Amino acid sequence: MSLLFVFNRIGFILYTGYYKHALKNPIFDEIIKTLFNGARYDNRVVSSLAILFIIIGLLGLFAPKHQIKMLNITAYFSIAIILFLNIANIVYYGIYGNVFDENLLEFLHEDTLTILKMSTEYPIFSSFSLFVILSVLISFIYFKLQNALFKPNVYQTTKPLKTFILFALFSLTQMFYINAQLSFVGASLDLSIEPAKDPFLMKITPGAFRNLYLLVRNYRQSHNLKFSDFAKETPLEVAKNYFNLKENPQNNLYELLTQTSRNNSNQTIQHVFYIVSESLSSWHFDPKFDAIGLTSALQDLAKKEHAHMLSAFIESAPRTVKSLDVQITGLPYINDNNLVNSGVILPSFPMAIGNITKTLGYKNNFYYGGSGIWNKLTSFTKKQGFHALYFNNHLLEFAKNKPYPKPIESNWGVHDNILFDYILENTNPNEKTFSMVMTLSNHAIKNVNLKAFGVPLEKIQQFVEKTPKSENLPDANSLGHIYWYDKVIVSFIKKASQKFPNSLFIITGDHFDRSYEYAKNDLYTIKSVPLILYSPTLKPKKISQVGSHLDIAPTIIELIAPEGFPFVSFGKPLFSNNTTNPPSHPNYALGYEAIATKDYFYNPSLGLRYLNESPKEPEDKQNDKKQNDKKQNDKKQNDKIEASKFYQQLESLKALSYYLLYHGANLKD
């Protein structure tokens, strides 16, 4: 069965890759890598079919006369399903230019006449005929081999040792096939493999079964959702309340979200670097860590004349994939299901930062040190306006023969120092570029050679040991990686600023750093990530003290687009070059399961968490303590009422986001 999968993939490469010219870079080593990586995915299917074969064989013991027939039917079914799905995947690629994805759902809902018309343009009938012929031929070969290799044993005796050896070999093979490695722990192939660089080879690596499984799973999960799961009102009523309109809106959602740049600066920004840092959190900047200089470089950067750091910034999603969904598309968080796995055809969103910067004439590059297959990053970023994706294969080739401290990668991908060096070399100084970067070295397993980079591990270890155990600090290795990244990213910013002076840098975290166990009881700590803005040539005005990931894209556009440029966004600019008439900001932010103002964070379950110990209220020395306490309590009650209203806005935002994804921009009841 494993060989059948291999031959299917070879056929895919020969027919679609070479004959149909889908293969852009026919490098032999890359093809071998694709066959090897694809086999790791396919072997899991083979293992499942082997288990099915054994179960049928055991059931056949209750009907010995029919056991052979039952096993033969199972074998034929296995051959047929493997051939059918793989041939169908090849035909599908010829129609849609991709392996099985959400377009398959539309194809299955097409009327018979449409499919018949498609069959005249695409080889649907001929491929089905090929499937029938190959099924019969391969089944015939299989049964001939079976009869030749497994002749009936006339003596009907079985040696226990031989049985044990066969069982052990079978078990080891199953373990290797299922876990994709000789281990009792399964490997996440989407994360661990290094795919081929060629887009076609990358797409076909996981295989038809894997793609179909993801499609069915995600379709079932996503289509259990209803608008009523997010709001009691109708979509029009929700939009009316969210946008504070007097009556139900007549226009579509994109029109309601349209805003214009007020940038009146003559300074042109040639390069934008939007850096999403793995697990970079506000708690990293806590003064308690200043003794070890945990984020000293970023803190020094934020104090520069041309830099700003927001005092309150809230995450928009709880994990990397979902955070990237929000920051790449501009679509607010709906639920924990990845957008590429939402079971619908994703549009190219007009509020996607890549689509907006593309309109402004920027060359859009996405950089990630991990696999390009992860989260379908290649097709996802391309759909949302990026011209190119650079991932682990590019970085490994770049790092070859360079004296980087080993190891240069973790199980997630290539380390951030190499990523930043590659960006410096890959950025064209003669064209406008927008570079979105996702780092990864601060993700477990954290294996940077910290000593080789001069990280003071002994000092950090002493700091951890002196800190009360009740605070449950991260270990020295985790803190060391935060320290290391802080110095690496600022080093990159300094080098990039010199090489590309007309640049804008945005630094944020994807989500709260969960390595700080003790902090999980604190609402601000678990929801807050930093936002640092720096440009050597700009002195923008800060519009708001609070923001979320949704506000980053409109902030960038406000700073780089010409005055009057229209764009779509759920967020609002946080900074502007227009110091006299900047755009407005509501001065509250809607994040992941929480809202934020400059004074507090709020979640219905955890309540108010003030950024200072108590709400700010000037003390009246002439009033006694009881009166002051009453004022404080009244202030808290008013804040809670206000926060509840803001949280209702968050619920409405999720409802509108759901509606936009599943029903489009035209609002209807």
Task: Give the ranges of each region predicted by the language model.
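Transmembrane and membrane-interface helices of multi-pass
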Residues: 1-225
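Alpha-helix initiation and N-capping motif
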Residues: 4, 101, 112, 206-209, ...
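A general boundary/transition motif marking the beginning of the first structured unit of a protein
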Residues: 27, 103, 196-204, 227, ...
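Residues that form generic nucleotide/phosphate-binding pockets
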Residues: 38, 42, 118, 144, ...
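Short alpha-helical "patches" and their helix-cap loops
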Residues: 69, 224-234, 340-345, 570-572
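Membrane/wall-proximal cationic-aromatic binding patches
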Residues: 121, 125, 192-199, 205-275, ...
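Solvent-exposed soluble domains appended to multi-pass membrane proteins
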Residues: 244-625, 634-669
